[in-house]
């Protein structure tokens, strides 16, 4: 396999990182809604942790996207 083909294979595999971020964020928010439904008074406590966790999870997807762009345009 040529180097160009391996480059595009790596770009395609970077989708796995973005898929993981999407699944992670959906799990975080579904668990938040589940927790609020069980205990409505915990909403304010949960929100700060949920937003921090979602931001970190989404950052991994963005890093994967940036890596794919670097592979496309730089490598």
Curated annotation (Swiss-Prot):
Gene Ontology molecular function terms on file: lipid binding; proton-transporting ATP synthase activity, rotational mechanism
Keywords, comma-separated and alphabetical: ATP synthesis, Cell inner membrane, Cell membrane, CF(0), Hydrogen ion transport, Ion transport, Lipid-binding, Membrane, Transmembrane, Transmembrane helix, Transport
Subcellular location: Cell inner membrane
Topological type in the membrane: Multi-pass membrane protein
GO CC terms: plasma membrane; proton-transporting ATP synthase complex; proton-transporting two-sector ATPase complex, proton-transporting domain
Subunit structure comment from the entry: F-type ATPases have 2 components, F(1) - the catalytic core - and F(0) - the membrane proton channel. F(1) has five subunits: alpha(3), beta(3), gamma(1), delta(1), epsilon(1). F(0) has three main subunits: a(1), b(2) and c(10-14). The alpha and beta chains form an alternating ring which encloses part of the gamma chain. F(1) is attached to F(0) by a central stalk formed by the gamma and epsilon chains, while a peripheral stalk is formed by the delta and b chains.
Family to which this protein belongs: Belongs to the ATPase C chain family.
Name recorded for this polypeptide: ATP synthase subunit c
Organism, scientific name: Neorickettsia sennetsu (strain ATCC VR-367 / Miyayama)
């Amino acid at each position: 396999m040529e180097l160009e083909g391996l480059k595009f294979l790596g770009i395609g595999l970077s989708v796995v990182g973005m898929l993981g971020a999407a699944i992670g964020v959906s799990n975080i928010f579904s668990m938040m809604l589940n927790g609020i439904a069980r205990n409505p008074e915990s909403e304010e406590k949960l929100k700060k942790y949920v937003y921090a966790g979602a931001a970190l999870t989404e950052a991994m997807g963005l890093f994967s996207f940036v890596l794919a762009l670097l592979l496309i345009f730089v490598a």
